[in-house]
Amino acid sequence: MSGRGFLLLALLLLVTVEATRVEKKHSGILLAWSGPRNRFVRIGRRDMQSPLLSERLRFRALGFRQPSSQKQ
């Protein structure tokens, strides 16, 4: 694995661990950043369908249509 790939993997792991920690305290956080595509992503939202509520992370880009059973 190249150095860049290793750093990317380490960063992804760190973000996942931190989001899991935050998820146990809060229902979720909203992140936004600007770039070629302005994106808003909710991280750490609990998946109520999952038996592993505090362990599973849902990454959902806002603006995509949600299934009717998962609307807030």
UniProtKB/Swiss-Prot annotation:
Family: Belongs to the FARP (FMRFamide related peptide) family.
UniProt-annotated location(s): Secreted
Protein name: Conorfamide-Tx2
Main location: secreted
Residues under site feature: Key residue for high activating potency against MRGPRX1 receptors: 43
Highest taxon, organism lineage: Eukaryota
UniProt keyword Signal, yes or no: yes
Region annotated Positively charged region crucial for activity against MRGPRX1 receptors, chain positions: 32-39
Organ and tissue specificity: Expressed by the venom duct.
Additional observations: The mature peptide does not contain cysteine residue.
Annotated organism of origin: Conus textile (Cloth-of-gold cone)
GO molecular function terms attached to this record: toxin activity
Chain positions listed as propeptide in the UniProt record: 20-25, 44-72
Modified sites of kind Isoleucine amide: 43
Signal peptide (from-to): 1-19
Gene Ontology, cellular component aspect: extracellular region
Function: This peptide activates human sensory neuron-specific G-protein coupled receptors MRGPRX1, but not mouse receptors (EC(50)=0.54 uM). Compared with the agonist chloroquine (anti-malaria drug), it is 600-fold more potent. In vivo, induces itch sensation, since intradermal cheek injection into humanized transgenic mouse (mouse MRGPRX1 replaced by human MRGPRX1) induces scratching.
Keyword annotations from UniProtKB, A to Z: Amidation, Cleavage on pair of basic residues, G-protein coupled receptor impairing toxin, Neurotoxin, Secreted, Signal, Toxin
